Amino acid sequence: LQAVAVFKQLPEAAALAAANKRVQNLLKKADAALGEVNESLLQQDEEKALYAAAQGLQPKIAAAVAEGNFRTALSELASVKPQVDAFFDGVMVMAEDAAVKQNRLNLLNRLAEQMNAVADIALLGE
């Protein structure tokens, strides 16, 4: 909890909270159960980059959390801000193609799970 309080003072905290809020708002619109990301359905460079970043985060966050180093885990999450921003700027999540739309929601859900495995990211924005 102390690490979260310290991290909350950093500029990255607000960015992480904003990204989390945006992700959560989109996930509320999911009309099917969320599952695994299908790499073959990733079409745009921005979604491929976010997927790669999310893949890379998994072991780093797991290791940091296992060591009780939540500040490092939060910093790792904040490090993907450029990919998250590019994704939201360049990708229409609610695509007409249902499979592509579902896959994009799956990707965002994976990111949300990683964010909230560390702490309740929504609290960083308060």
Swiss-Prot record:
One of its GO terms (molecular function) is glycine-tRNA ligase activity. It is found in: Cytoplasm. Its main location: cytoplasm. PANTHER family: GLYCINE--TRNA LIGASE, CHLOROPLASTIC_MITOCHONDRIAL 2, GLYCYL-TRNA SYNTHETASE. It comes from Neisseria gonorrhoeae. This is Glycine--tRNA ligase beta subunit. Tetramer of two alpha and two beta subunits. The keyword Cytoplasm applies. It catalyses: tRNA(Gly) + glycine + ATP = glycyl-tRNA(Gly) + AMP + diphosphate. It comes from the Bacteria. Its EC number is 6.1.1.14. Belongs to the class-II aminoacyl-tRNA synthetase family. GO terms for biological process: arginyl-tRNA aminoacylation; glycyl-tRNA aminoacylation. PROSITE patterns: AA_TRNA_LIGASE_II_GLYAB. InterPro entries: DALR_anticod-bd (IPR008909), Gly-tRNA-synth_heterodimer (IPR006194).
